[in-house]
């Protein structure tokens, strides 16, 4: 008999795979991956053709801590979206594929997307 925590994590992995089997990032249009945990938010630009992370920002990065972006809330999520958009522009990236992972497009995930759009990324 399996326990409920194992089933919950198994369902989370399945949801993420269901989303990611359709999405593929390239060097011209990388994948914008958003992960949230109980304490932090992580945002990455990933080139799946070479399997490399092009840029990343999070609430645990030194630059975010210096800017006061340490709590996990919607305002911080929007600021992280703007930051990743600025980094993407410096890498000549203007179009991305949004990867929400196993999370609903709601709340913090939606605010990261809105911040990235405000920063100039298109998806």
UniProtKB/Swiss-Prot annotation:
It comes from the Bacteria. Signal peptide: none annotated. Disulfide bonds: none annotated. GO terms for cellular component: cytosolic large ribosomal subunit. Belongs to the universal ribosomal protein uL18 family. This is one of the proteins that bind and probably mediate the attachment of the 5S RNA into the large ribosomal subunit, where it forms part of the central protuberance. This is Large ribosomal subunit protein uL18. The lineage of its organism: Bacteria, Pseudomonadati, Chlamydiota, Chlamydiia, Chlamydiales.
